[in-house]
């Protein structure tokens, strides 16, 4: 099948769905300079706050999803998973192999997208599924709102390496992006997809501990959140294993090793591991 390269210097990026995730991605892309906002579009039906949010960035707001598909070279599904099927079948007549479809909808597999936008044709008495098959599945997480997403993508169908590089550049503007086989996405959901909530809980618990030890609430929360941010930066920037970084600050008989001892007695590692495994299991059940 012939490949139709996406024109890097002129392509239009369209979002089906104008929620918070789409907004955070658009802001990151526009702020990074990867793509000017006047080459990004979405559709807002009646929500004036959503319209204002996108127009304030400089994004073109169109009348409906069909207009977005017709206008765009790269179409991003950023809607709730339960409505992806209906939207995909609605826009199916407007698709061509020149368009790249990207889904950020949780739990929606590449094979599902391909099935929903395919056309069933009878050829020599044999039923064949034909039509659009140029897809990339992307899983960002909520820190995309502040440009610190942990994102994973998987190429499907006839998506090319060039398509992957393009999407990597776009989503890399709101954090870091990796490529992985789609079969790993349930585990990825359990780790990076649900992970921010685990860390929010940890920050809250650290702050509560600070309050219990006598700190004012505002100071405790500020120290807890900055400590988590700084520790994460040390892991990513130092290249050291987190275990080594932990050992570096755990002096014999000191305060840190006393705190670590309490965490280990309470099964801290196992609790986090079990949370990831449980969320991954639930993701498999829902998909």
Task: Report each predicted region and the residues it spans.
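Small-residue helix-packing motif on alpha-helices
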Residues: 40, 68, 84, 216-223, ...
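Short pre-catalytic strand/loop immediately N-terminal to key active-site residues, enriched for Gly-Thr
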Residues: 11, 135-136, 185-190, 242-247
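Short acidic capping loops at alpha-helix termini that bridge into adjacent secondary structure
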Residues: 36-40, 97-99, 134, 218
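NAD(P)-dependent Rossmann-like dehydrogenase/reductase catalytic/cofactor-binding core
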Residues: 2-9, 225-287
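Internal alpha-helical scaffold of NAD(P)-dependent oxidoreductase catalytic cores
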Residues: 112, 116-134, 150-187, 200-237, ...
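Rossmann-like NAD(P)(H) cofactor-binding subdomain of soluble oxidoreductases
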Residues: 57, 65-77, 81-153
């Amino acid at each position: 099948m012939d490949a139709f390269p996406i024109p890097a210097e002129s392509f239009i990026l369209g979002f089906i769905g104008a929620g918070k995730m789409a907004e955070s991605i658009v802001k990151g892309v526009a702020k990074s300079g990867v793509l000017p906002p006047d080459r990004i579009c979405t559709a807002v039906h009646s929500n004036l706050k959503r319209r204002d949010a996108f127009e304030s960035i400089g994004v073109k707001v169109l009348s409906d999803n069909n207009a977005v598909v017709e206008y765009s070279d790269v179409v991003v599904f950023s809607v709730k998973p339960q409505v992806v099927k209906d939207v995909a079948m609605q826009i199916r007549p407007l698709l061509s192999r020149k368009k790249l479809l990207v889904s950020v909808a949780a739990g929606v597999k590449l094979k599902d997208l391909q099935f929903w936008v395919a056309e069933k044709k009878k050829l020599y008495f044999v039923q064949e599924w034909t039509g659009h098959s140029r897809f990339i599945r992307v899983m960002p997480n909520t820190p995309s709102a502040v440009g610190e997403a942990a994102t994973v993508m998987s190429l499907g169908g006839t998506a090319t390496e060039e398509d992957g590089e393009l999407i990597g550049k776009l989503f890399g503007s709101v954090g870091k992006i990796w490529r992985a086989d789609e079969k790993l996405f349930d585990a990825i959901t359990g780790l990076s997809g649900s992970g921010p909530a685990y860390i929010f809980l940890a920050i809250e618990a650290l702050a509560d501990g600070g309050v219990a030890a006598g700190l004012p609430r505002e100071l405790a929360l500020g120290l807890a959140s900055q400590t988590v941010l700084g520790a994460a930066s040390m892991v990513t920037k130092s290249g050291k294993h987190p275990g080594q970084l932990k050992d570096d600050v755990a002096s014999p008989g000191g305060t840190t090793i006393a705190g670590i001892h309490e965490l280990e007695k309470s099964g801290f590692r196992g609790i986090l591991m079990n949370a990831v495994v449980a969320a991954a299991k639930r993701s498999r059940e829902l998909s």
